[in-house]
Design a protein with these regions (language model features):
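Amphipathic alpha-helical hairpins
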Residues: 1-175
Length: 175
């Protein structure tokens, strides 16, 4: 069992954070199909399914980084992702209007994206400082994909899902 992280060097912090986000991405690969199925907006379900494919690629990139550093491919329980996904699960289990649930799913998904963007931004910076240039490039690629996924979620929210959810409270929609 992995105990506390070692803060005696930036390299150890880098490896610990790699293990953490690796586990987080693996958790996400498991959760995204359920989240996609819970979405009622076809565009939202499609965006989540597309991001599942990207997330599978993120796992592969992280495995490449571990291997390039001569490390065993091993995760460390990502409690942050676990908590975010638990909140998403609660949303999926709630009774209510479909459009409001979709708005809540977007919010939960954006929290995940922002968590990942923070993780990949830090990891990229650490990799650059440590001279792990190939790893930095892979991490930058993943960071850009996470940013694009967040932007897509923004577009969906602002492109009608939030308005549909608002109409429920205004008596404009009965599902």
């Amino acid at each position: 069992m992995e105990s506390t992280m070692s803060l005696d060097s930036l390299q150890n912090l880098f490896v610990t954070e790699l293990k953490d986000i690796y586990n987080g991405e693996k958790q996400l690969v498991t959760a995204l199909p359920r989240i996609s199925k819970a979405a009622r907006s076809p565009q939202l379900a499609e965006a989540i399914t597309k991001h599942l494919k990207e997330t599978e690629g993120h796992v592969v990139r992280l495995e490449q980084i571990f291997q390039s550093l001569g490390l065993a491919v091993r995760g460390k329980k990502c409690k942050g992702m676990e908590g975010l996904l638990e909140e998403g699960k609660e949303i999926m289990e709630e009774e209510g209007q479909e459009s409001v649930r979709d708005a809540a799913l977007i919010s939960a998904a954006q929290k995940v994206e922002h968590y990942e963007m923070a993780a990949y931004g830090c990891l990229r910076s650490y990799a650059q400082i440590l001279g792990h240039n190939d790893a930095a490039k892979l991490l930058e690629q993943t960071l850009k994909e996470e940013e694009a996924a967040d932007e897509k979620l923004n577009e969906l929210a602002e492109g009608g899902i939030n308005e549909a959810a608002a109409a429920v409270g205004a008596g404009g929609e009965n599902e």
